[in-house]
Amino acid sequence: MANSSLSQVLLMWKPGKIQKGPCSAEQQTLTSRLLRDTETCRRNFRNFPYPDVAGPRKALCQLRELCLKWLRPEVHSKEQILELLVLEQFLSILPGEVRTWVNSQYPESSEEVVALVEDLTQILEEEEAPQSSALPQDTPEDDPNHDPNPASQAGWLSDVVTKDLVTFNDVAVDITQEDWELMPPVQKELYKTVTLQNYWNMVSLGLTVYRPTVIPVLEEPWMVIKEIVEGPNPEWEPKAQAQCPAKHLPELKQDGTQTVKLEDSYDDDNDDSVESPPVCAFGMIHIDEEGFSVKSELSQEDPTEEYLSKCDIYRVTFEKHTNLGVQFDTQSDDKTALYNESKPPFSNASSGGAVRGKILPGDKPYSCNVCGKQFRKYPSLLAHRENHAKEKAYECEECGKEFKHLSSLIAHQRMHTGEKPYECHQCGKAFSQRAHLTIHQRIHTGEKPYKCEDCGKDFSQRAHLTIHQRTHTGEKPYKCLECSKTFSHSSSLINHQRVHTGEKPYICNECGKTFSQSTHLLQHQKIHTGKKPYKCNECWKVFSQSTYLIRHQRIHSGEKCYKCTACGKAFAHSSTLIQHQTTHTGEKSYICNVCGKAFSQSANLTQHHRTHTGEKPYKCSVCGKAFSQSVHLTQHQRIHNGEKPFKCNTCGKAYRQGANLTQHQRVHTGEKPYKCHHCGKAFIYSSSLNQHRRTHTGERPYKCSHCNKDFSQRTCLIQHQRIHTGEKPYGCRICGKAFTQSTNLIQHQRVHTGARHRN
């Protein structure tokens, strides 16, 4: 069926409305006006533009109002609203001319549209019959363009649908020359990728479309060859005038004044193609005298290859596709083929060689010029390139950092500007991101929505729960590349790596001391401020850090929550467990650069360094005595304040140091863990074992500087030195007599008490 016959029928035939019952002229007029108003509201809703100034919230409100005016839920039922949506979709899938004509009849329902189209089909079939009988009888049967099946002539609707269902301009992304010049390279690449992706989506649906050149030709030198003076195809919208390079175009075989109608459609018969050559969707004039088929089969690997071999193609200027310019290249067989710089399937640019004909199994001729990944089909390459184009498309102008999403870039820029728009209403603290404010507010509300399924412990942040769960699983995903030590937290790995690099980026503004961890700096700064906000409820002792308070409270509770998996021994502190575990592994990864001595802990190495430097940073504020270790200062301060926090549960005796309490408890338990390998004698204290060993070896390491007399024990040397100094530190409180040794004082006190020495 020729398109002109369809146009004449649509122009002349005015069907009557399908009546649902008796209706007056006034009711018909009112119904027609109501339908026109409904159609106007629908168009206002569908064509509503996004107002840049008003903002998204106001735009959404306006769009919702337009939708209510169209669907009218206060009047229509759910079934009626559903019918309106189905009617709209049904009208949208009709062929272009039929859709326009049906819309002009203002149908009330989908059934009425069906009736209109069926009546139109019947009329066209009746007019088709006499035209088919009037065809010339000498048509050769072997004509490839001749269709002997009359049924195909009656399928006018499917032909129109094939030609009118989708054109490339329906899905094209139009830009102006000014937009193209302002585009960054990443967005230009995205524009090319999206355009080719739309083309391949249409090809995959079996639609006959002609492949555009993706790279815009706005900056290339063009000259006008021929203008199309007739009206454009209804499917196209006016664009800037496109021009072609003269050097690629042969002389046209038409008069310069002849006009070409882009809206003319054509079928397989090609009887009327002599006077005016057909024009494809991108302005190609086809002058092959044997004609061509719009619905010719396209090759799966090269959809334009078979079609391009049938005819010569000439480029004409038209008022359309400035942004999708087409170039030409002469082949060896004097045929003209399309190509573009975006490496199409029939270009050898993307695959490293000529890709012609069918691709053999296993071949992957299309490669990504970004990462080198290869693909068998070109649409797969296009989809892959689109991912590259979207990757980190937003760049910070301050530091050059790139982001994948615009929202991430906006949040990042607040680091440079210092903007903190999200403020806590309870304490006034401000944050740069809303998520940080949400997490902070849980401090005030006490909310802990994340719960550990193993132990039931609650957390305010998901990240804290994830870190905690590693204590149950034993997972340590972070590994040091230097010593292969693993950690459960990334922050622990970063802190550990500073042991190898020696980096100490955190500096105290008061004394200039540097630290490898920020927490250590915060702890150190409390020495200058003297602030101790954490208080024990049992003994009222105060601490500068909460961790110190927690450790101290375990003295009162006796809790030992850290257990060694090797021997089962339990400890109150995790650091003590770590120290103990090195006795099983024998690992000593911390080495002194001065003497080469190795240690199992970094703290021990730090303390050892002070023996070389003589540094004693911990000073007593009462007597001024300095110490190399903080624990020694803490123990010394108990001499001044009389504190003895370590108490024996058996006899009640108290001690200043926990080690002294441990040694004392062996008196009650009878434990003697230190055994001599020579005679088998056991001792409570390690110092007693060391003194006993000297009886076997004869070693006397302690020498008097006055008389050169040597001793096996340090206490014996101290007592001997009092002979030279005359010091008598042990005085009787009753008579005031002084003695050089404590044993002599004890014997003297029996004189006052009357006690006798037992033999």
Curated annotation (Swiss-Prot):
* Residue ranges annotated for the SCAN box domain, each copy included: 42-124
Annotated C2H2-type zinc fingers sit at 366-388, 394-416, 422-444, 450-472, 478-500, 506-528, 534-556, 562-584, 590-612, 618-640, 646-668, 674-696, 702-724, 730-752
What are the UniProt keywords, alphabetically?
A: DNA-binding, Metal-binding, Nucleus, Repeat, Transcription, Transcription regulation, Zinc, Zinc-finger
UniProt GO cellular component terms:
nucleus
An example of a Gene Ontology BP annotation on this entry? positive regulation of DNA-templated transcription
Ranges for the region named Disordered are: 127-154
What tissues express this gene product?
Expressed in brain and at low levels in kidney and spleen and few hematopoietic cell lines.
| One Pfam family, short name | KRAB
MF terms from GO for this chain are: DNA binding; zinc ion binding
Residues in KRAB domain copies? 166-234
PANTHER family, from UniProt? C2H2-TYPE DOMAIN-CONTAINING PROTEIN, ZNF44 PROTEIN
Family to which the UniProt record says this protein belongs: Belongs to the krueppel C2H2-type zinc-finger protein family.
This chain's protein is named Zinc finger protein 287
Organism encoding this protein: Mus musculus (Mouse)
